[in-house]
């Protein structure tokens, strides 16, 4: 993509009401535009990152055996009355009437809707286990939306729902999602800590939040420092194997949100292993048994011919919120430092002298070669000053910058910069592609 053809409304300053770094940088880099309290338009740069995060989540859900679908944003109020939750959400739920005066709502979550889908089509235990998921926009009418996409009113979430015949099978499904979440966050360059959490209005007796440590986190969290060094399960994990040992190891260390915190247990840790910090919730998983299947009559015929309510779990990831969380974890004084897996472009190609025949030819050759090799390239061929070009590239945080100037071209070289480390190297043009591909 040529920068002159791309829509990138970069600003020198962030609005004064942007209180945290991620909100400031998302506004400055032209990733989002606020349309109302907690409601944003996703501009091209931000949308590219959003789609890359969405794809990582999709790949890890598929790897764990979940099946993608899509449910609507608008739901019938009668389904929520059936489950008994219509009044539980209070003013946080946006209630709507259609032209026929039927009660509708903009879904804050999807347990009722997916249960209705399930009970319509699944009748026998032979159709189990089943895990269905979607990635869809939600709306919760927060009293005080703040921190940009971290606590907006409209947001993109991945919701998965598992259905099993027995509690034992349902807990196995829970463990699969537990491991899939750790893999997904690891691929995004994040260390996510699973913490026992309150189940809230979703309900159930087992729940974990996945927390990213950050100074601007919304709540206090407490954990054993050893958790920060544990590796993710890995992409070669066999999801059909017994995952109990892995989950037991992860949950054997102390980790809790403020609501579940046990001061005595925390203080029993050696002092140098106690981590008391702020955290950002990026995922939340629940096992809630028959909380929804019983009142909504989501039953299947078991092996003995008896009709039994299915055991359910739900698993959420805040896809749009993850952009803010990644920026909070990956930035410096010059701007964003994107992990390669979620960056909007892989390489920023800077032409220092547009109109110079040798520079133009070298840039065109590199642009074509990188693109052919599958690299996403943002090519800055504008007439802006050198300082402005470098500052803009640092601000938007692409993992690699390649600078082509008249002096280097005469020597057959370009400068390659690693945005994360700041290291710069002069590289022969014919060697540059190999270096970038091996990064």
UniProtKB/Swiss-Prot annotation:
Q: Which is a Gene Ontology cellular component entry for this protein?
A: cytosol
Q: Which organism is it from?
A: Hyphomonas neptunium (strain ATCC 15444)
Sorted alphabetically, which keywords does the UniProt record give?
Answer: Aminoacyl-tRNA synthetase, ATP-binding, Cytoplasm, Ligase, Nucleotide-binding, Protein biosynthesis
Q: Where in the cell is it found?
A: Cytoplasm
Q: Which InterPro entries match?
A: aa-tRNA-synt_IIb (IPR002314), aa-tRNA-synth_II (IPR006195), aa-tRNA-synth_II/BPL/LPL (IPR045864), Anticodon-bd (IPR004154), Anticodon-bd_dom_sf (IPR036621), Pro-tRNA-ligase_IIa (IPR002316), Pro-tRNA-synth_IIa_bac-type (IPR004500), Pro-tRNA_synthetase (IPR050062)
Report quaternary structure and partners: Homodimer.
What does the UniProt function comment say about this protein?
Answer: Catalyzes the attachment of proline to tRNA(Pro) in a two-step reaction: proline is first activated by ATP to form Pro-AMP and then transferred to the acceptor end of tRNA(Pro).
Gene3D superfamilies with a match to the protein in the record: Anticodon-binding domain, Bira Bifunctional Protein, Domain 2
What family does this chain come from, according to its entry? Belongs to the class-II aminoacyl-tRNA synthetase family. ProS type 2 subfamily.
Tell me what this protein is called. Proline--tRNA ligase
- Which coarse location class describes where this protein primarily resides? cytoplasm
Choose any GO biological process term that the UniProt entry carries and state it: prolyl-tRNA aminoacylation
**One Pfam family this chain carries?**
HGTP_anticodon
Under catalytic activity, the entry for this protein gives: tRNA(Pro) + L-proline + ATP = L-prolyl-tRNA(Pro) + AMP + diphosphate
Q: Name one GO molecular function term.
A: proline-tRNA ligase activity
Q: What is its EC number?
A: 6.1.1.15
């Amino acid at each position: 993509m040529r920068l002159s053809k791309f829509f990138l409304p970069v600003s020198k300053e962030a609005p004064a009401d942007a209180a945290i770094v991620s909100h400031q940088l998302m506004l400055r880099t032209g990733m989002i535009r606020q349309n109302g309290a907690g409601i944003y338009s996703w501009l091209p740069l931000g949308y590219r990152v959003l789609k890359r995060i969405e794809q990582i989540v999709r790949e890890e859900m598929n790897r764990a055996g979940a099946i993608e679908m899509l449910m609507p944003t608008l739901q019938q109020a009668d389904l929520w009355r059936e489950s008994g939750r219509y009044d539980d959400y209070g003013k946080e739920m946006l209630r709507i009437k259609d032209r026929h005066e039927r009660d509708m709502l903009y879904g804050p979550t999807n347990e009722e809707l997916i249960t209705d889908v399930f009970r319509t089509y699944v009748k026998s235990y032979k159709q189990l286990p089943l895990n269905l998921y979607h990635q869809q926009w939600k709306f919760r009418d927060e009293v005080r939306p703040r921190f940009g996409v971290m606590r907006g009113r409209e947001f993109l979430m991945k919701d998965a729902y598992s259905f099993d015949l027995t509690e034992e099978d349902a807990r196995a499904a829970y463990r699969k999602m537990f491991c899939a979440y750790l893999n997904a966050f690891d691929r995004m360059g994040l260390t996510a800590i699973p913490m026992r959490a309150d189940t809230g209005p979703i309900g159930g007796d087992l729940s974990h939040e996945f927390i990213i440590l950050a100074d601007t986190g919304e709540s206090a969290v407490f954990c054993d420092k050893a958790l920060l060094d544990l590796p993710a399960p890995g992409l070669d994990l066999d999801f059909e194997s017994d995952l109990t040992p892995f989950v037991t190891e992860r949950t054997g260390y102390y980790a809790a949100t403020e609501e579940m915190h046990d001061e005595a247990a925390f203080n029993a840790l050696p002092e140098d292993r106690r981590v008391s910090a702020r955290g950002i919730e990026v995922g939340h998983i629940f096992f809630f048994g028959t909380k929804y299947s019983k009142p909504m009559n989501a039953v299947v015929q078991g092996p003995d011919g008896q009709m039994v309510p299915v055991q359910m779990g739900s698993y959420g990831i805040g896809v749009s919120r993850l952009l803010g969380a990644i920026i909070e974890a990956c930035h410096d004084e010059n701007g964003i430092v994107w992990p390669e897996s979620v960056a909007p472009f892989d390489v920023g190609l800077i032409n220092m002298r547009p109109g110079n025949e040798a520079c133009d030819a070298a840039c065109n050759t590199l642009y074509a070669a990188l693109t052919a090799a599958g690299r996403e390239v943002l090519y800055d061929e504008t007439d802006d000053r050198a300082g402005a070009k470098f500052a803009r590239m640092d601000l938007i945080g692409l993992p690699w910058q390649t600078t082509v100037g008249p002096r280097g071209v005469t020597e057959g070289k370009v400068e390659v910069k690693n945005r994360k480390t700041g290291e710069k190297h002069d590289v022969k043009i014919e060697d540059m592609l190999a270096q970038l591909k091996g990064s």
